[in-house]
Regions:
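Extracytoplasmic/periplasmic solute-binding protein
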Residues: 160-192
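Alpha-helix boundary/capping residues
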Residues: 25, 29, 91, 154, ...
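N-terminal segment of the mature folded domain
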Residues: 38-164
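C-terminal motif of bacterial Sec signal peptides marking the signal peptidase cleavage site
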Residues: 31-34
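N-terminal export and membrane-targeting signals
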Residues: 2-27
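Flexible glycine/proline-enriched surface loops and loop-helix/loop-strand junctions
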Residues: 133-135, 170-179, 209-215
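Ligand-binding pocket segment of bilobal, Venus flytrap-like solute-binding proteins
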Residues: 185-215
Length: 215
């Protein structure tokens, strides 16, 4: 697969029981989204919901808050889409997301925050990876173009000539590629699709992005 500067690298092989699968995994800069005006609650418990990638960091923050300020922090790691939705519905004080609010969400946040804009606070930097599970094949190489064609359904088998050309000397099976992706709204999905749109624009169109999978 290509990096953003155009160089190639290898997807990570996923060591699971699932066979012959390709998974889209991504988390770049995860964010906390909250109101810029007066907080909903300055005593007792701060509630948040969202990206699982932030869970460990928020656990550390929670330890500091209770120790230094006597304030509890409760975070429900259900995914970026759910976190943003619960924030906009005023169910939680802040939402965690792997991608910022889109234009519609930002507009809705003005009502949520009583006329104030929502703040995006960069919180965690996490790696981006494409994982695959193909027993007996290590060090698989894919370009961004080939990867986009897999996710679009233009390449459907592991021994497709375009994949074989990128992996000389490797024995690739005549098996269908099963693409696995998030079914819910996900900031991870948004980041993967933005990567594909940037690195393989002839295959993955610029408008095929967002928290819902477009492949």
């Amino acid at each position: 697969m290509d990096t953003l500067d155009g160089t190639a690298f290898r997807p990570r092989r996923a060591k699971t029981r699932m066979r012959k699968t390709l998974l889209a995994l991504c988390a770049v800069s995860t964010l906390l989204t909250g109101c810029a005006g007066n907080p909903d609650n300055t005593n007792g418990t701060l509630t948040g919901e969202g990206a699982t990638s932030q869970q460990n960091a928020i656990n550390l923050f929670a330890d500091v808050l209770i120790r230094e300020h006597g304030l509890n922090l409760a975070y429900n790691a259900t995914g970026s889409g759910a976190g943003v939705q619960k924030f906009l519905e005023s169910v939680v004080v802040f939402g965690g997301s792997d991608s910022p609010l889109d234009a519609d969400e930002a507009k809705r946040s003005l009502d949520r925050c009583k006329g104030h804009p929502a703040w995006h606070l960069p919180l965690v930097i996490s790696p981006v990876a494409i994982a695959y599970n193909l027993p007996g094949v290590d060090g698989l190489v894919l370009t961004a173009d080939a990867l986009a064609k897999v996710f679009k359904g233009d390449i459907t088998k592991w021994n497709d000539a375009r994949i074989k050309k990128l992996n000389p000397g490797k024995t690739l099976p005549d098996e269908h590629i099963n693409v696995i992706f998030r079914s819910d709204k996900s900031g991870t999905t948004d980041n993967v699709q933005k990567f594909l749109a940037y690195t393989a624009p002839k295959v993955w169109k610029a408008d095929a992005v967002g928290k819902v999978w477009q492949g």
